[in-house]
């Protein structure tokens, strides 16, 4: 996954670790005669409607819908996809114009023109789903369709990052004849214009993608069909890969399985390891009588042992994180370590007693059972152990499947809950802006006027993102002082595949979303 916001980062760097030696290669022919490439993941979509999703549904959207801009392999900035060209037409970065490719259609044959683009963007804001992508468009004033092929975006303030917003799957273009602007689309079919058509969809089970012959864009499809299978636990995911029921896994492999595959227990397996800006963190509900107390939040932040979580639960396949902005991005600091240092029961007790809290604090912690892999349950058991070992907390744990989990936190049902975040684009803005303000990715208002009214607008005037360190340093300090969000770890990205599958190294875009069209079978081995 999610609410989101803006701008720049290096493309995910991936290094392939081959577990097989002595192979001769290969050409990237069409592999339709061997059937679709089968991809397994624990990251199932929550919806098929782009206007309703700011989460990991985007992984599917990227492949079945189209956006004006997208990321070709190796790109660090968005490039035209449905658009032929896009640019700011003024010096203040407030008017952005795109010319569409000629002859665009949706997979159902309906015309995709400037009116459809305007309708799609306006629809997001009109429906305004809680936890949906409307929050990405806070700098947009209006959309204008000029003739059939020109779309002009008028912004209400300078925003050099707006092209990155248009490149997110949240801005997918939909067919006005198929998608009402009064409600979220129901059902298990779509009308898109991406590289693939969704031939069959079984929620929580599988998505069958076949080549969209009407697609016009930059993607050079290297296969004719992909089937994505959705798993509720990592064990079953890894077992099906070993049993050759899958060609590749994306998201959800447990740490033990990653290590096992890397140690070459499967002779015909490749593991691709990549850098990732994905993070996991705790969210505190300010309306809860206990989680709403600053002293309680600070005590939890003081007690969390991130190194133990990374090593004991995730076997060092993740890194401890002490800021909401991950390492490797402009402006990253260690604000939470600076505030709290190493875990300390004595310091945590002082936070509570100074606030007049002398009893054990009862807290309910919630996590999703089927989104981030089976290690999530172990992680929350470890957090429970750490907090209760201090003698300061009594913790109860609760888990729910993702679809109902999202509904719960958007309704404010959870005192404390875990979330993962996959960036919309690799910029510090995208790790601060989505979580603050009246409308955010968490469904829980977080007023932070110093950030939303001053620091973010200042940073968005700056096209050179190396010059925003000061603003995001201050923002991270505010987040640490509030302790409404407590970062836990930053992930690494692992793809495990059969040795006859290639393209994994090129398949991840800058937000670690898989571009299925890059995968193909080796035709000689």
Language model features with spans:
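Detector for C-terminal structural segments
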Residues: 19, 32, 202, 303-331, ...
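N-terminal lobe/hinge region of extracytoplasmic solute-binding protein
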Residues: 40-91, 122, 191-192
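Surface-exposed binding/hinge segments that line
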Residues: 97-99, 134-178, 200
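Alpha-helical secondary-structure segments
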Residues: 112-120, 148-154, 194-195, 223-225, ...
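Gly/Pro-rich hinge or "lid" segments in bacterial periplasmic/extracellular proteins
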Residues: 167-220, 225
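Ligand-site clamp/hinge motif
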Residues: 213-259
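Structural transition elements
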Residues: 320-355, 371-378
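Ligand/substrate-recognition segments at binding pockets and active sites
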Residues: 353-423
């Amino acid at each position: 996954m999610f609410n989101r916001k803006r701008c720049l980062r290096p493309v995910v760097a991936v290094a392939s670790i081959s577990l097989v030696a002595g192979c001769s290669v290969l050409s990237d022919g069409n592999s339709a005669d061997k059937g679709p490439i089968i991809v397994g993941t624990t990251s199932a979509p929550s919806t098929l409607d782009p206007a309703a999703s700011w989460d990991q549904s985007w992984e599917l959207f990227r492949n079945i819908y189209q956006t004006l801009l997208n990321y070709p392999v190796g790109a660090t900035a968005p490039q035209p996809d449905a658009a032929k060209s896009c640019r700011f037409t003024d010096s203040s970065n407030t008017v952005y114009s795109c010319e569409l490719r000629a002859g665009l259609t949706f997979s159902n044959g309906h015309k995709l023109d400037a009116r459809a683009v305007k309708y799609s963007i306006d629809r997001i804001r009109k429906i305004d789903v809680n936890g949906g992508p409307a929050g990405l468009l806070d700098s947009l004033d209006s959309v204008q369709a000029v003739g059939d092929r020109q779309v002009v975006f008028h912004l209400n303030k300078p925003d050099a990052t707006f092209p990155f917003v248009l490149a997110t799957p949240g801005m997918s273009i939909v067919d006005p004849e198929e998608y009402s602007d009064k409600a979220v689309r129901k059902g298990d079919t779509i009308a898109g214009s991406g590289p693939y058509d969704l031939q069959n969809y079984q929620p929580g089970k599988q998505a069958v993608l076949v080549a969209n012959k009407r697609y016009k864009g930059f993607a050079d499809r290297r296969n004719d069909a992909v089937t994505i299978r959705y798993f509720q636990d990592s064990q079953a995911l890894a077992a099906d890969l070993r049993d050759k029921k899958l060609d590749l896994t994306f998201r959800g492999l447990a740490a033990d399985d990653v290590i096992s595959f890397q140690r070459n227990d499967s002779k015909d397996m490749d593991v691709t390891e990549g850098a990732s800006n994905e993070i996991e963190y705790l969210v505190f509900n300010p309306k809860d009588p206990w989680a709403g107390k600053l002293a309680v939040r600070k005590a939890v932040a003081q007690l969390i042992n991130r190194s133990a979580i990374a090593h004991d639960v995730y076997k060092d396949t993740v890194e401890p994180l002490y800021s909401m902005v991950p390492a490797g991005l402009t402006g990253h600091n260690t604000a939470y370590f600076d505030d709290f240092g190493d875990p300390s029961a004595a310091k945590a007790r002082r936070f509570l007693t100074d606030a007049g809290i002398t009893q054990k604090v009862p807290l309910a912690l919630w996590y999703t059972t089927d989104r981030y892999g089976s290690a999530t349950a172990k992680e929350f058991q470890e957090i429970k152990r750490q907090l209760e070992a201090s003698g300061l907390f009594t913790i109860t744990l609760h888990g729910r499947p993702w679809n109902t989990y999202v509904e719960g936190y958007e309704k404010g049902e959870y005192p404390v809950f875990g979330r993962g975040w996959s960036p919309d684009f690799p910029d510090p803005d995208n790790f601060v802006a989505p979580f603050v303000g009246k409308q955010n990715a968490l469904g829980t208002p977080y007023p932070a006027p110093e950030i939303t009214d001053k620091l973010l607008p200042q940073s968005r005037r700056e096209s050179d993102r190396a010059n925003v360190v000061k603003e995001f340093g201050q923002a991270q300090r505010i987040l640490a002082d509030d302790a409404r969000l407590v970062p836990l770890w930053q992930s690494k990205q692992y793809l495990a595949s059969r040795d006859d599958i290639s393209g994994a190294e090129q398949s991840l875009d800058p937000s670690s979303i898989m571009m299925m069209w890059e995968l193909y079978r080796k035709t000689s081995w």
